[in-house]
């Protein structure tokens, strides 16, 4: 983990010392960190206590390494997880990236279920990128080259099956987020990956 991620993790560890356990949790990478869930929920009359433990740039290996401060220490009754977008890359595992992701999803669910017996688990589907925005550069397109609709369809099919196998839930909100070519709608994103509040 880089220094920025380490700092966020340290802050979460401090916050977990005073957290009210047994509440609702959203956790994962940037799409969770940038999710203004508490504000949106309050605007809809939802007064539940909701915690956010997302860290931008986090991958699944890092999430598993720090699963206690990011999830288990809070002992949530409901947990919503969106992690793995940063694993859609050939950098570390080559053409085995999808296999590695699915193995990690199983590990995450197994660790939660082994410790939090009554927690309801919701896996949130991966959202496609938009590689056709005017702001895209050769470097950004290269970085996102695997984040195409076909790969997201593959990346979401197996987790849905895994979730069912483990008695968990799978949430796919992409129908309202994608355009005619199954890329992220331009009005919802500022860089082709991360979302404006209107998308949430």
Spans of features found by a protein language model:
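Conserved SGNH/GDSL esterase-like catalytic core that processes O-acyl groups on lipids
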Residues: 2-103
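Residues at the C-termini of beta-strands that transition into short coil/loop
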Residues: 28, 54-56, 125, 174-177
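N-terminal cationic-hydrophobic initiation segments that often serve targeting/anchoring roles
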Residues: 71-72, 109, 113-114, 163
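Generic structural signal for well-ordered alpha-helices
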Residues: 105-110, 156
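A short helix->loop->beta-strand "cap" motif at the edges of active sites that frequently abuts
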Residues: 116-121
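Catalytic His-Asp segment of secreted/periplasmic serine-dependent ester chemistry enzymes
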Residues: 128-200
């Amino acid at each position: 983990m880089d220094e920025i991620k380490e700092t966020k993790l340290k802050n979460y560890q401090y916050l977990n010392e005073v957290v009210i356990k047994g509440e609702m949790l959203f956790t994962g990478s940037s799409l969770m960190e940038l999710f203004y869930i508490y504000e949106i929920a309050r605007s809809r009359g939802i007064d539940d206590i909701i915690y956010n433990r997302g860290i931008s740039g986090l991958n699944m290996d890092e999430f598993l390494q720090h699963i206690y401060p990011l999830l288990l220490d809070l002992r949530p009754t409901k947990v919503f997880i969106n992690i793995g977008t940063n694993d859609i890359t050939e950098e570390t595992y080559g053409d085995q990236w999808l296999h590695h992701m699915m193995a990690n999803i199983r590990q995450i669910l197994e660790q939660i279920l082994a410790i939090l017996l009554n927690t309801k688990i919701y896996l949130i589907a991966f959202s496609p990128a938009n590689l056709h925005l005017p702001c895209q550069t050769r470097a950004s397109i290269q970085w996102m080259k695997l984040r195409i609709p076909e790969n997201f369809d593959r990346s979401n099919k197996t987790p849905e099956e895994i979730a069912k196998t483990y008695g968990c839930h799978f949430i796919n909100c992409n129908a309202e987020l994608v355009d005619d070519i199954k890329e992220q709608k331009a009005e919802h994103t500022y860089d082709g990956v991360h979302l404006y509040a209107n998308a949430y």
